[in-house]
Amino acid sequence: SHTHLSGTGHSDLGDILIMPQTGKLQLNPGTAKDPDSGYRSRYSHETEKASVGYYEVTLADNNVRAQFTTTPRVGVHKYTFHGIYNYDGKVLWSTLRVENDTLLTGYRITNGWSRANYTYFAISLSKPIKTYGYRDMKQLKYRGFWRKFDIYNNFPEIAGQGVVTYFNFDNTDRKPITVKVALSAVSTEGALKNLK
């Protein structure tokens, strides 16, 4: 994830988590004792490479090579497909909008080390999204009208307390997917400017 506090001794930011997966869709993190129960992955320190401003590792369970670097305003991810922290009550609200097949925007409001901490984001993808869907893991009871459309599959925007999103890509060319993540503490527009 893109934001962390160093040495706080308690829960930190952990905002805008991206976890590449292949195979069965996993929307929960799982446990350290049973990594197969969720999306977390095993890895070996032997596959790690690190230097100032750069880190890479192979996520063993899905055989995904994950590479990370940064610019002054953007975190850059690169995932090559071969083949978390989860504090309940931390997220007050989050929203994600699919602007087009390679651009995502949104924000998340968290509670913890500060009250109502806003993190806005813009995410650029090097490959177009084929299909996508959402799950709200903490659906709020709503006594309003019954929706006659499916908001959980290929719908452009969702909001909630426990929003989890997945994206499917056509990876027949086996080329890596580069993900650029820009953040702003001010606005989505600020995150979009930082992305450029």
Question: Model-found features: residue ranges?
Answer:
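Accessory carbohydrate-recognition regions in carbohydrate-active enzymes
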Residues: 1-196
